[in-house]
Swiss-Prot record:
Sugar attachment sites: N434
Gene: CYP075
Family the UniProt entry places it in: Belongs to the cytochrome P450 family.
Name of the protein this chain belongs to: Cytochrome P450 monooxygenase 75
EC nos: 1.-.-.-
Length: 613
């Protein structure tokens, strides 16, 4: 049985902290033995107690001095520094945790960038870290200087209990191997699984319509999370978890129901397997986000047990039988002489799932488990989050809704199933999705660690480059970058899909493509980008075909999940006007769900479809 993360961490830290006092005692004992001078107990005790903080202070001072000299040697400077008010800058850590729990996304980062510039140095508990929203620095980290950055040991330790050694938690040769193993599956032909999208979207829309007919609002975030989970499990494993078969939740003041979205805190005592799996996914990711926020001291929160252990048990109970069945099929095929096709032939096999593809390449159950879980989390949460925010904006901006629906009816019609060619022609649909991804990128923060020392570009053309020490974390926030007016213009806070269609494209985006990074960039750019665009586009088209109007229903949400009233007075940018509370674990989500009401379209032929729930 593995030890809880906190136990070995505490042992390591105790040994480190005890080193200086032990040295003091050894020196005092040496003096007494070789000079017959017995030092008084009180100065030895005082020096022993003070030796640890003094050692830490000296190490921090020396590190800063060394960095300053190294920067001068390279003709560089250190970025502006966020200086805290408490020992070890613990107030900085406290403010970041408070923002995560009770604030608006990137509150603390926005304040820093406004006061100190778009790249800031932080020193918490003696460690140096950088925070940036500068597109040129992000470009350096993700692309031009890619080989000098990695996920880093600390990040991988924080994520290991959930992501294992999967593609999102691997570096170097391991990452290259995972990437090469997965890439062939995500070709244009494979990601056009529109029959799957059609079947699942019809189920989802039917569930919504039934609830609307009963006079209730629907938590769209819950519903779309079921749609993406069912689509992802069928697409990736060929075995659907069928979460859409479970009842939808009711508004907070209506009938109590089984679990909906974990943020609503309405988990029933006996949820279905699908509901339990969905809940476990989100709760595990919340733990991971808290670990990242705590930094190196995260194991202190897990002294008795791993906080992801129970959630992963539920997930593994679902995944393990699927993996064992796939490996058994592979063995059976080998036994009857069917053999394994060469890669080229197999890559063209119709109906092959990602798991089928991976099983042809490896029989290692741990590798298979980690890889499919990584892809499942990415395939479910990112798409669900974006579609949730698209529907929010369509409710907030009826003119955008009407224009988008008009494009759908013109290009596809009120009943037809959209094709890949249809979606390619729908420029306004893509603009709506992109504008949503700009204001609410599903991964608001990300991190890389430098391997060697180097420099980062200074936004001041006349300034010296910024020095980057080795083994230093660089956290970059596309959430803040996507809203900075120096990159997107004076209307950066406004939701306006036309910015991706008019002259602002050439003025801002074409000039610097790295100001828009919803799918990351460089060698680690999202492999499933086109799959996500196809899935989101398909579902939105179906939504426009079925419904002629939509509006928010905040009265249906738990009152404590709504934005605090003071945001309208003290908030910055969109924080002042938003009608939902965005939060983040690994990806963005809406606190308490996204409750909406919709009006069924008169021009949709309800008899034209045969939908089974």
């Amino acid at each position: 049985m593995a030890l809880p993360p906190g136990v070995p961490f505490l042992i390591r830290v105790s040994l480190i902290l005890a080193f200086a006092p032990v040295c003091v005692v050894i020196v005092a004992n040496f003096i007494w033995r070789h000079t017959d001078v017995a030092l008084p107990t009180w100065p030895v005790t005082l020096l022993s107690v003070a030796s640890t903080p003094l050692t830490i202070l000296v190490r921090v001072w020396y590190r800063q001095w060394k960095y300053q000299r190294a920067a001068a040697r390279l003709g560089a400077i250190m970025p502006p520094r966020w200086v805290g008010k408490k020992l070890g800058n613990l107030d900085i850590l406290k403010e970041m945790l408070q923002t995560m729990q009770s604030g608006y996304i990137a509150d603390f980062a926005w304040k820093l960038f406004n006061n100190l510039g778009n790249t800031v140095q932080m020193n918490v508990l003696g460690g140096t870290a950088y925070l940036t929203c500068d597109p040129n620095i992000i470009k350096s980290v993700l692309a031009t200087d890619f080989n000098n950055f990695e996920k880093g040991d600390l990040f991988k330790q924080e994520m290991a209990s959930v992501l294992g050694t999967g593609v999102f938690n691997a570096d170097g040769d391991m990452w290259k191997w995972h990437r090469a193993m997965t890439r062939p599956f995500f070709s244009r032909d494979r990601i056009s699984h529109f029959e799957l999208f059609d079947r699942r979207s019809e189920q989802a829309v039917a569930k919504m319509t039934e609830r609307f007919h009963s006079g209730y609002a629907v938590d769209f975030q819950d519903l779309i999370s079921r749609f993406t989970l069912d689509s992802a499990t069928e697409f990736l494993f060929g075995s659907c978890v069928n979460s859409l078969h479970s009842p939808l939740p009711y508004p907070h003041n209506q009938h109590p129901t089984p679990f909906s979205h974990p943020s609503s805190k309405s988990l029933a005592s006996n949820p279905s397997r699908a509901e339990a799996v969905a809940s476990a996914f989100m709760r595990a990711q919340i733990v991971l986000a808290e670990r990242v926020a705590m930094g190196a001291i995260w194991p202190l929160l897990e002294m008795r047990k791993s906080r992801t252990g129970e959630h992963m048990r539920i997930i593994d109970e679902y995944l393990d039988p699927i993996l064992k069945d796939a490996l058994r099929r592979k063995e059976d095929m080998a036994n009857i002489g069917a053999g394994i096709h060469d890669d080229k032939e197999s890559s063209d096999t119709d109906g092959e799932t990602l798991l089928d593809h991976l099983v042809r390449l490896t029989s290692d159950p741990v590798v298979l488990h980690d890889e499919v879980l990584n892809i499942l989390i990415a395939g479910r949460d990112t798409t669900a989050g974006t579609l949730t925010f698209v529907v929010y904006f369509l409710c907030m901006y009826p003119d955008v809704f009407n224009r988008l629906r008009a494009e759908v009816l013109e290009k596809v019609g009120p009943n037809a199933r959209p094709t890949y060619a249809d979606i390619k022609e729908m420029r306004y649909l893509r603009a709506v999705i992109n504008e949503t991804l700009r204001l609410y990128p599903v991964v608001p923060f990300n991190i890389r660690w430098s391997i060697h020392e180097g420099t980062l570009p200074n936004p001041d053309p006349n300034g010296k480059p910024f020095y980057l020490p080795p083994k230093t974390p660089v956290t970059y926030t596309v959430f803040a970058m996507h809203r900075r007016k120096e990159y997107w213009g004076p209307d950066a806070d406004e939701f306006d899909p036309d910015r991706f269609l008019d002259d602002r494209v050439a003025k801002y985006l074409t000039k610097n493509p790295f100001i828009f990074l919803p799918f990351n960039a460089g060698p680690r750019i999202c492999l499933g980008q086109q799959f996500a665009y196809n899935e989101m586009s398909f579902f939105l088209i179906k939504l426009m075909q079925h419904f002629s109007a939509m509006e928010l229903a905040p009265e249906a949400a738990p009152p404590e999940s709504l934005p605090p009233a003071e945001w309208a007075v003290t908030g910055w940018g969109r924080k002042r006007i938003e009608r939902f509370w965005p939060k983040s674990h690994l990806t963005l989500y809406s606190n308490g769900g996204m409750w909406v009401k919709m009006v069924e379209a008169d021009d949709f032929d309800k008899d034209d479809r045969d939908v089974g729930i």
